[in-house]
A protein has these predicted regions:
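Conserved ABC transporter NBD signature motif
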Residues: 7-15, 24
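Conserved ABC ATPase "signature" region
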Residues: 48, 63-81
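Conserved ABC ATPase signature
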Residues: 60, 85-89, 93
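Conserved catalytic motifs of ABC-family nucleotide-binding domains
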Residues: 106
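Catalytic Walker B motif of ABC-type/P-loop ATPase nucleotide-binding domains
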Residues: 110-113
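H-loop/switch region of ABC-family ATPase nucleotide-binding domains
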Residues: 146-147
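H-loop (His-switch) and adjacent beta-strand-loop-beta switch element
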Residues: 159-172
Length: 195
């Protein structure tokens, strides 16, 4: 966990550092584009690791936990992968299983760094649609870091732009993707932008 350079990160009005590991994991899930390889772990078992905040370190799954894993794999379209070795699936399939693991945590906040990495266009749209559904139908706060502006524009309810020396406030997609903002974000001249 990185310490903030300034200020504090609050979750439900409390400093993030006030939460113990399991309590934090029940509130906040993180999906990174790369993960450690595991030996002889099925996709079901890998996704089930998201239940550890509820099962404890021994990871003994109850029937409720197993159902949560099945539901998460189904939601991301990875049910057929459940019995396959996590190391023997494609990068795109791995992204789906990583998302299922995060969903298994049943967090209130889901942070994703470049979740569409390694996915083809169809896979990107499917994954982003799942994230949008989680936000709109389940009330999950979904925060996504993307460099693909076209994808962000399709799904975002709010956009925060990271400039070389500053960060914008929350913008509507219309504001964020206005030509003048894109030019400023990428330090483009009008001619470069319109080329």
């Amino acid at each position: 966990q990185l310490a903030p350079l300034g200020g504090a990160v609050l979750l439900d009005g409390r400093s993030l550092t006030d939460y113990t590991g399991p309590a934090r994991a029940r509130k906040l899930a993180l999906m990174l584009p790369h993960t450690r390889r595991t030996e002889l772990t099925s996709c079901f078992e890998f996704a089930a690791a998201g239940r550890i905040p509820y099962t404890g370190r021994l990871g003994i799954l109850s029937d409720t936990d197993r159902q949560a894993v099945r539901d998460a794999l189904e939601l991301v379209g990875a049910s057929p992968l459940a019995g396959r070795d996590f190391n023997c699936i494609s990068d795109g399939q791995r992204q789906r299983v990583l998302l299922a693991r995060a969903i298994c945590q049943q967090p209130g906040v889901l942070l994703l760094d470049e979740p569409t990495s390694f996915l083809d266009v169809k896979g990107k749209i499917e994954l982003l649609t799942i994230l949008q559904k989680l936000a709109h139908e389940q009330g999950l706060a979904v925060i996504v870091s993307l460099h693909e502006l076209d994808m962000a524009q399709k799904i975002a309810d709010a956009v925060v732009c990271v400039f070389p020396h500053s960060v914008s406030g929350a913008l509507t997609p219309k504001e964020a993707f206005a030509p003048e903002n894109i030019r400023a974000l990428y330090s483009l001249t009008k001619e470069q932008y319109e080329a």
